[in-house]
Amino acid sequence: MSKVIGIDLGTTNSCVAIMEGGEPIVIANAEGSRTTPSMVAITDSGERLVGQQAKRQAVTNPENTLFAIKRLIGRKFESEAVKKDIAISPFKIVKADNADAWVEVRGQKYSPPEISAMVLQKMKKTAEDYLGETVTDAVITVPAYFDDSQRQATKDAGKIAGLNVLRIINEPTAAALAYGLDKKKDEKIAVFDLGGGTFDISILELGEGVFEVKSTNGDTFLGGEDFDQNVIDWIADEFKKDQGIDLRNDKMALQRLKEAAEKAKCELSSSMETDINLPFITADASGPKHLNLKLTRAKLEAICANLIDKLEGPCRTALKDAGLSPSDIDEVILVGGMTRMPIVQKRVQDIFGKVPNRGVNPDEVVAIGAAIQGGVLKGDVKDVLLLDVTPLSLGIETLGGVMTRLIEKNSTIPCRKSQIFSTAADNQPAVSIHVLQGEREMAGDNKTLGNFELTGIPAAPRGVPQIEVTFDIDANGIVHVSAKDLGTGKEQSIRITASSGLSKEEIDKMVREAESHASEDKKKRELIEARNQADSLVYSTEKSLSEFGDKIDAAEKQKIEEGLAALKKAMEGNDADAIKKASDELMQASHKLAEAVYAKAQPAGEEQAGAAAHEGEAKGEKVVDADFEEVKEDKK
């Protein structure tokens, strides 16, 4: 079996590592660097340049040099994040036939996975040159808060690059593997990962070779590229004030600004002041113009204050989801080049109340972790168990527009959950399964991942057919959903593909709205549940009354009819408590009728009912009623 390589496919830079002699080793590229710029350029002759070669010619070829493509992967063209990128990008971002965001270079369209594949091919070649043999198997990392479509698109990029992607793992988890492999003591750690394009925070428990992720959060549109953009805007604004020329309108000048901004940002991590000198940046009728500015660390921190402030929210949420306070965290591991900024380190210290651990190389640690995971999968690394989580809840839409969750956020993956649903109407021949991802109570407030139908259900009263819906998340975090009619054995399934992913803005919006609308959502849900239960009660009472009404006296029958009328009236309103009260009163009034039904049914059905009850107990099934109203069993 050939070697398994670990690849950190980064927004700004990528890195590749392997396990050799039981130790992870980062491999230097042909240019002698241990990291490779995630850049691709197409020259006049159609030649593809990747990495440092692409970066070197970016100033003279800005429209055909692609960078930060990871921010487009698995995203729709119409998303706010993509619109923001279009406004500042020197290259052309276009709408694909499937509504995804693609790029156009020299008249040809490329999908983000295609461009990412070019970077992956460079990493593959780097490993092959070092090993002297062909490499096919790889573990590739993604931000922990990447959604289903982004993970799928990353896997597709690996396939395009000729790699057999054994596993997609989360970047903070990979970093934790690299940090904790030789640690013997049990500890709780926070991995703070601020890279070129994304921000992740993961809380893990380490002990006895087990790496268990307790929670994860983040922002897939916050990273070094955004810090660079703030600096670019400041430089351009200063120059415009001085010369009256907006350099953002000149793509070649803009590319020079980008390089200068990145260089200044890096220099200010170790010095208090830097000069930005760009001679012959542009020209007008009066002659050439030169740019010369001083930028201090304090000014840089002020320019980027709005981005620094965005780091705290996800950290607090991750701690809350893990059920921990900052004082419970033993170590905070810094990952990603942006964590070299002193202001970022200070903010991390303020959030967690302790000095962060800088014992790992923030640029290489993720690739090292990916290589370790490759070693685990190949069997070279023993006694290591990695337990990762899914970042968002998954479920389906049920009667009344409610989202019924099958898998909660921060559930350990891989995982599989099933629940039994039924039909909402008599003789219903098909059910539509609406697959959702998000944290809101109502289906319409969450993100649709897909829709499919289970047809050919035999005619039967509502509530009788049993439809088992199963959610399956694999170790890569990719979702599969199936629905099966337990009566006929007929099954239909859907694999959520890259075209139906979820953007980061939508995730953030969902979480924020979920918090602000929590009580409102709860009331809506309670009202719908009360209505659903009342509807079932009305249906069953009317059915029993028509069949067994002659077995009870007229006064009892009148009480039931009055109770039915009162409940129907209550159901027209929006008061859940009133509906529950009317339901209870109808149930009280129906006691005599229930006795008549029971007396009639017992002799004929006692044996059968007993058997069915035992079978249900054995399976421990949780049945949800036809109209997708949950019928809760007592907890066992």
From Swiss-Prot:
**What switches on its expression?**
By stress conditions e.g. heat shock.
Segments of skewed composition (Low complexity): 602-613
Give all Phosphothreonine modified positions.
T198
Compositionally biased region (Acidic residues): 626-636
Gene3D superfamilies reported in the protein's UniProt record: 1.20.1270.10, 3.30.420.40, Actin, Chain A, domain 4, Substrate Binding Domain Of DNAk, Chain A, domain 1
Would I find Methyltransferase among this entry's keywords? no
Q: Where is the composition biased (Basic and acidic residues)?
A: 614-625
Keyword terms of this UniProt record: ATP-binding, Chaperone, Nucleotide-binding, Phosphoprotein, Stress response
Disordered as annotated region, ranges: 602-636
> Superkingdom of this entry's organism?
Bacteria
- Show the Pfam families listed in the entry: HSP70
What family does this chain come from, according to its entry? Belongs to the heat shock protein 70 family.
- Protein name per its UniProtKB record: Chaperone protein DnaK
User: What gene, per UniProt, encodes this protein?
Assistant: dnaK
